[in-house]
A protein has these predicted regions:
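Nucleotide and nucleotide-moiety/phosphate-recognizing core
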Residues: 2-130, 142, 148-149, 160-168, ...
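General N-terminal targeting signals
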Residues: 82-83, 117, 137-138, 157, ...
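Short, positively charged, low-complexity/disordered linker segments
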Residues: 136-153, 208
């Protein structure tokens, strides 16, 4: 993959209605927020640019933010707005709630897309994952310019992307697992494994934990 050959668009403007209106991209799974995990996958894959279509958030270095017009107009409008900022010839279009998406998955999508207009993941049942794909930027721009509905499937399906089926290793969570419902979120947190609450000050800290933190961790049954 050539440096600078692809960028990332993260669609993060949903209302989280199935999660009781919670700020879904800001929910924590494992040691990080959902949106930070997706952004980290893009950075690790060598993305030249990461554009988030959604509210601005602190703590996401190297990320630019845009808002669809009008706000809340839906994913197609958000994609249209974000594409106006895209500068790379290829762009990954991703949901903001994919805690197990990794750089290796994005690299696989980018490689598969080389032979066509784009490539998307399919899950273990063969269902297309429209918000886990990589596309020719100009192809998307042309498609969205002439599209006046609000369905991503209706927009992207006719482009006939390459379907990429990745088989996770035993015990590895699937990269397409999203967090649309409370049940999805619980499953993702279970798969991510036990972690200490943020107030303990661990997170991604590089300094060794204090004795008090170690004791609390032992009481909670997790590693410090």
């Amino acid at each position: 993959m050539n440096p600078g050959s692809f960028g990332v668009i993260i669609l993060a403007g949903g209302r989280g209605s199935r999660l009781g209106g919670q700020d879904k991209p800001g929910l924590v799974v494992g040691d990080d927020t959902l949106i930070a995990s997706v952004a980290r996958a893009g950075t690790g894959a060598g993305a030249a640019q990461i554009v988030v279509a959604g509210p601005e958030r602190p703590g996401l270095a190297g990320v630019s933010f845009v808002c669809e017009e009008p706000p809340g107009a839906g994913p197609v409008a958000a994609l249209r707005r974000a594409l106006a900022e895209a500068s790379a010839p290829w762009v990954a279009v991703l949901a903001a709630d994919l805690p197990f998406l990794r750089a290796s998955h994005l690299k696989a999508l980018r490689a598969a897309a080389e032979g066509g207009p784009g490539a998307i993941l399919v899950d273990d049942t063969g269902r297309p994952q429209w918000l886990a794909g990589c596309w020719q930027t100009e192809t998307l721009r042309r498609a969205v310019a002439g599209y006046h509905q609000d369905s991503l499937r209706g927009l992207l399906g006719p482009l006939a992307p390459v379907l990429v089926r990745l088989t996770p290793s035993p015990g590895e969570p699937p990269p397409w697992l999203d967090c649309d419902t409370p049940e999805d979120l619980r499953r993702a947190r279970d798969l991510a494994g036990p972690h200490l609450p943020d107030w303990l000050g661990l997170g991604r800290a590089r300094e060794p934990p204090s004795l008090a933190v170690i004791v609390i961790a032992q009481l909670l049954g997790v590693k410090a």
